[in-house]
UniProtKB/Swiss-Prot annotation:
This is Alpha-crystallin A chain. Signal peptide: none annotated. Zn(2+) 1 binds at H83, E85. Residues 124-145 are annotated as: Disordered. It comes from the Eukaryota. It is found in: Cytoplasm; Nucleus.
Length: 145
């Protein structure tokens, strides 16, 4: 899992007012695990590559399928998301991200699929056939709901 991918989540109180007083024990200051705890339910991607298939999951709950672009270019898969300014609970916000991951050489790029669940989880998967490396080409992958 990659824990540094927040796709437009709000700020937390401790992001704005960290403990800065020198009289406070260091044990009560920002925890090393704070980012892990805060990210447990937002903006995380998970990459898995096992013997049968390669899978990537992204939390893109703030984007609709037409605001997402998924492409395979050479040995990489690229995902981009962008939406214009819209109103939320705290005012107006626009979001944009771009991620790029290297595909294992055994993934059959022509069989890669991508789907978006109702709760905003984007899943890309491709089989790892036993035949070894496959031909490489550039192509766009449609995001299906």
């Amino acid at each position: 899992r990659l824990f540094d991918q927040f796709f437009g989540e709000g700020m937390f109180d401790h992001d704005l007012l960290p403990f800065t007083s020198p009289t406070i024990s260091p044990f009560y200051r920002q925890s090393l695990f704070r980012n892990f705890l805060d990210s447990s339910n937002s903006g995380i991607s998970e990459v898995r590559s096992d013997r049968d298939k390669f899978t990537v999951h992204w939390d893109v709950k703030h984007f609709s399928p037409d605001e997402l672009s998924v492409k395979v270019i050479d040995d990489f898969v690229e995902i981009q998301g962008k939406h214009g300014e819209r109103q939320d609970d705290h005012g107006y916000i626009s979001r944009e991200f771009h991620r790029r991951y290297r595909l294992p050489s055994t993934v059959d790029q022509s069989a890669i699929t991508c789907s978006l669940s109702a709760d905003g989880l984007l899943t890309l998967s491709g089989p790892n056939p036993a035949g070894g490396p496959n031909g490489r080409s550039d192509r766009s992958i449609p995001v299906c709901r």
